[in-house]
């Protein structure tokens, strides 16, 4: 048997990644993971000061090039601009992680149509717009990895989450459709479906008794996911180790969807 590449498949040295919503939470964790594997990274956020600070921290910690750019992924012009800026900075974009997203909670009677629309604009339109902007660059290179951040709520239901669950279900189907559309171009498209992670957004509710009861009842491992536990999935899908994966959903949910 000829030698197999093994762990070398996960090496991202020489790759350039663009991560939306990269200033904090899972986006920043994934950016750090990719940089630790050798990639140069561009992070985007709606808040310029936050994303600039995050990029500087990644660059200092891992010794890779890291740039922070302000962008609203629901704005087509912003999506085109950051793709051009990232491509100009690094000469290419090998990896796109569509991570930017928002959430809202409430019953269908409580929520307004405007609140519903705001979630869909960021979580669905933003994914499509970023993919639309980056695909021509990847096609020209004959290589690309598109990673969409979906959710367990894209495949299972949860009350009082209709806008978010609807948006993530759309991301699941967009991932599959794009995977088929791009299969012959050298571009793969996969999704990560996180379960409950202890992100900065969730820290305030982590000690709530009702939340604790839900985590124990729904998650097989009976705990929150930690930030570093998303990194392996991102590195896998961004690297050559996932070359035979496209249209796949990678469940990183502590066993929630195994029940």
Which residue stretches match the model-derived regions?
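Short C-terminal tail/terminal secondary-structure segment
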Residues: 2-8, 156, 235, 246-259
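Substrate-binding pocket helix/loop in short-chain dehydrogenase/reductase
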Residues: 79, 107-108, 112-117, 215
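Active-site helix of classical SDR
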Residues: 131, 167, 175
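Residue(s) in the substrate-gating loop at a strand-loop-helix junction
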Residues: 151
